[in-house]
A protein has these predicted regions:
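Catalytic micro-motifs at enzyme active sites that drive phosphoryl/nucleotidyl and oxygen chemistry
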Residues: 48, 86-91, 122
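Generic, well-ordered alpha-helical segments
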Residues: 21, 49-57, 68, 72, ...
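Anion-binding and metal-coordination hotspots
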Residues: 2-4, 62, 70-82, 93-508
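Short helix-loop boundary/capping segments at the starts of domains
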Residues: 34-42, 66-71, 82-89
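Short hydrophobic "helix-edge" motifs at membrane interfaces and signal-peptide entry regions
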Residues: 13-14, 44, 85-87, 128-129, ...
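Hydrophobic alpha-helical membrane-insertion signals
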Residues: 1-27
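Basic, short loop/linker segments at the boundary and entry of helix-turn-helix/winged-helix-like folds
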Residues: 22-63
């Protein structure tokens, strides 16, 4: 005896929502997206052409697809045909994958996702799921949608560009100048640009045209030296126009693309080659990637941004500048604890708990008793000198100023040993401002409240990366270009937020 079923019979009810459980994710997505103000969608309205799909419907379908770990436009279109929950969101419309992909990178999409995050943050605060008082910040590297062997290195570019300049100088002096009447003077101090080379090519073409005209007007029987000169001019013209100028233009475009970086990918020029944690070959191979920075509370991503530089130190200040709410407390690991970051946060009167590079080592008993610890040295305030536990004296000599890669000015006091030959180190370099900032930070981190808040960081921000990589399968970007990657990552993080929001609201 089996349960009766018939696939050819019409069934009731016909509303798709009645086939879905009441706590299904699509109802939460629909509620969150539909409550957005219509003004946020004005960029998607057009006064011409056939009626377009509603942007709220398209955003909802993208968020649901991303929440299921599906990122391909063709697979999203397939979901609209086969998936009942997706059919509920689309009203049983089937949107072409081309439309989906075009909408995903549309002009107003980045601003729309930003507004979606702001709206969800306020909703979470109203429902007391977050307070917006404390930001837990961390970063991860996501592999770019680029060929792993499409790298361009800054040092190699500078090396080959310098070689090209040498070749041009020699070639112009030996081959070009003797051939033409108009003398060409090259600046040996400044590099020759591709525009200058094209101008030289124009001069050569004019010279060649004059020579051709001269040969036609006054032909010579037998051997003609002018024809030999014409062959040489044609050869030189090809060299300048098709070789030197092309290579010079390529190196110039490379230098413009670097934008302070040491590498980029030809496939996705905004991506930088970074050392990834997933190193299956165990050879430290670099891959084109982006640095994703997120700020969370209660495992909800409140803010995110994408950077092309691999280190977290230089990302903190620009990341916080784009945060849409009031900054109160920032919690981050040792990758963010630079002098500039700590100083700027103090100037903005933002509370912060940020480890610095030596914090964990300073708490160990061996370091506290070590002679390397400056706390164990005797400091003479009058003479401005430090005395090593074994008796060597280091006296103040001068102040050294240096700039970081972000043009931040550091002031370092230099001390030299009285007996440099026998002393364990000849000099001592002291950044007093940074030492004071670190001492203040150490006191805050070791306080009972500081310990409690900082311990929360590991279970707040780091699980989010595991969820989007392991649960949603987002380990590689689906789009190319920094702007498009920012949209792509925003959809993934928002989908992860909505999964959590749906689960927690239905539990309550």
């Amino acid at each position: 005896m089996h349960i009766h079923y018939n696939t050819n019979q019409t069934t009731l009810p016909l509303e798709i929502s009645s086939f879905l459980p009441q706590d299904h994710l699509v109802f939460t997505i629909e509620k969150v997206v539909n409550t957005l103000e219509d003004s946020h969608f004005h960029a998607f309205y057009h006064a011409f052409g056939r009626p377009s799909y509603h942007p709220k419907m398209l955003v909802s379908t993208l968020l649901f697809a991303y929440s299921q770990g599906i990122f391909s436009g063709r697979k999203i279109e397939k979901m609209m045909v086969e998936n009942l929950a997706m059919q509920y969101l689309t009203g049983q419309l089937v949107v072409s994958y081309r439309t989906i992909n075009r909408f995903r990178v549309a002009e107003g999409m980045e601003e729309l996702i930003r507004n979606l995050f702001i709206d969800l943050n306020l909703r979470l605060k109203m429902e007391e799921l977050v307070t917006l008082d404390c930001l837990f910040i961390d970063g991860t590297k996501i592999e770019a949608n680029a060929n792993k062997y499409s790298f361009v290195w800054k040092k190699a570019t500078e090396k080959f560009s310098a070689k090209l300049q040498e070749q041009i100088q020699v070639y112009f002096q030996e081959e070009i100048t003797p051939l033409i009447h108009q003398a060409i003077e090259l600046d040996t101090q400044e590099p020759i640009s591709s525009e200058q080379l094209l101008a030289f090519a124009q001069v050569l073409e004019e010279e060649l045209e004059k020579l051709n005209q001269d040969i036609e007007e006054t032909p010579v029987k037998g051997k003609d030296e002018r024809k030999t000169q014409r062959r040489k001019l044609k050869k030189v013209l090809r060299k300048v126009k098709d070789d030197f100028s092309v290579r010079a233009e390529k190196y110039e475009s490379y230098q413009e693309t670097f934008e302070g970086r040491n590498s980029f990918s030809k496939t996705d020029t905004d991506a930088t080659f970074m050392r990834m944690k997933e190193d299956h070959m165990k050879n430290g191979q670099l891959k084109a990637a982006y640095n994703l920075q997120i700020a969370t509370e209660n495992q909800f991503v409140l803010h995110y941004d994408v950077f092309s530089n691999p280190t977290d130190t230089k990302t903190l200040l620009p990341f916080l500048e784009t945060y849409p709410h009031d900054l109160k407390t920032v919690v981050a690991d040792a990758g963010y604890g630079s002098e500039e970051n700590l100083l700027r946060l103090d100037e903005k009167e933002v509370n912060h708990l940020i480890k610095y590079a030596m914090f964990d080592k300073e708490q160990k008993r061996g370091y506290k008793q070590s002679a390397r610890n400056l706390g164990n040295w005797h400091y003479d305030n009058k003479e401005d000198s430090y005395t090593h536990p074994d008796g060597w004296c280091y006296r103040f000599h001068h102040i050294k100023h240096q700039k970081t890669q972000t043009d931040f000015q550091q002031e370092i006091k230099v001390y030299y040993a009285d007996e440099p030959e026998s002393a364990p180190q000849k000099g001592l370099y002291m950044n007093e401002r940074y030492q004071n900032l670190k001492a203040k930070e150490c006191q805050a981190l070791l306080s009972p409240k500081g310990r409690q808040i900082f311990a929360q960081r590991k279970i707040d921000v780091e699980p989010v990366f595991g969820q989007i990589k392991a649960c949603l399968g987002y380990k590689r970007c689906n789009l190319r270009g920094k702007r498009q990657v920012r949209i792509d990552m925003g959809l993934v993080l928002m989908a992860n937020n909505l999964l959590k929001y749906n689960k927690r609201t239905n539990q309550n």
